[in-house]
Amino acid sequence: MAVQTALAQDKLWVRYDNRFQANKAVSIANADSIEVKTNQLKVYLPDEKTTTVALTADKGTIQFTDPGRYLLKPSTYSGTNYENQKATSGYNFAHSLESEHFVVFWDVRYGSNPAKIQYPGDGNVANANTILQVAEKCWKIYVGELGFLEEGKSTTDKYKIQLYVPYQKDWRADASGTNGTNGGFTGIGHFNPWAAVARGGHTIAHEVGHTFQYLVSADLGTDGAGHLDRGWRWGWGGGSDNGWWESCADWQAYQIFPDRQFTDGEYFEQHLEKHHLNLLHDDWRYACCYIQDWWCMKYGRDFIGRMWRETKSGEDPVQTYIRMNKLNQAQFNDELMEGYMRMATWDIDGVRDRAKHRIGQHKKRLKTVNTTQRIYSTEPATCIQNYGYHITNMQRPKAGTVVKAHFKGLTDAEGYHYVNKNRAGWRYAFVALMNDNTRVYGEVKADKEGTAELTIPEDHGTCKNLFFVVMGAPTQHWSHPWTSGKASDTWSQNEEQWPYEVQFEETRPI
């Protein structure tokens, strides 16, 4: 065993080369001297007494600083001999790099340089140091700010999260967690070099986010080996999967790379195309990563983490949100509608400045019924579903103008797919953005047939933008099930649509 220089202290540790072996702490309080042998350590005390501490013959380092976390051998690689330094494929300790909370293993075929993990003939070069830097930033945000884990009460108090770089050119990016070969739980993720460098590190942060989601159940689950009763380890409404993992992982990653949230040319564009769908629709799962900012503004920076930790078996996120915040269905609809109205101008803490160049970019989803009378209606391809929404850019009126929208919710229009007509509901209102960046929010209406209106103020300059916002707001919630590989319309309760017709006064869609 190697021995580090001793400092004046009362304890030393053994850090084994086999990182799956728990570190050993040895008391040297009041010692005059110590003697180290191959498999034992003798501590000599002032009164001529001697304490002998048995050590294993395993290779390791005796050190005077706490080595911190070690590793749990994952069942995923139960047959892998990580101590085999002559391995010609797979993983071993010789091809790994550690930080405080994470370890990166790369396939031995990549070679021994942690800064050049490259598949032959491929231009993507991963760097284990960079991976660890991103991962540690994730730890700081996901634990310290978002509250996914509670230090001192987590499996990560003992075990590092494991990240692997498999030997392949084709895209691979996945993460969650697994059981240890002898019990326990560990977070585990994989990304090949292409994925490791993709999106400026966003993919790493996304996959690391999945390990934290898994570890919620590992820390809090009570149902035995699977720990499937916490942290959304289930589907709902008859499905076996859920897209909330992806929605939150992308949102988590944007907390690490906030400058990408409205500029990366990917998820925001998908969001604009898909947000008429059910909030929990599988087709929207990767791009539904913006409502979380509103919920955190309303209930605190750690609210999404608390949702993951406080959800109960079988609940979907809407049910968890309603229960946690002691709301009824109508109140939930009102809160969600407020968030969507704020999204018209991105009037949300944390994104307000970064998203300002995106104001006015929502898609027009209304077709003209009568130009002269300014009557418009939805179309089946993009009609709102439960908790989906439209934000329509409207012609800007002069200050002092009263704009009106005579709204009619439809439950018998041809070409639409109706589910639970008796639960049909809508929310609708105007939002104005003034020249001095003041936001003016109109009264939200919920009547199947009613009129929303807004007076454009005269004391904030001209009106820069006017929007009409409509949300699908069922009077009673039902879950949207999904199983990977099955189309959403496999379930009869899915693909609900809430069409509407609206006639405007003093403005029109543009």
PLM regions and their residue ranges:
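Second-shell loop/turn segments in exported
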Residues: 118-130, 191-199, 233-239, 274-282, ...
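Zn2+-dependent metallopeptidase catalytic core
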Residues: 70-102, 106-186, 192-208, 212-222, ...
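Surface-exposed patches in mature extracellular/periplasmic domains of secreted proteins
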Residues: 143-161, 220-227, 238-242, 262-268, ...
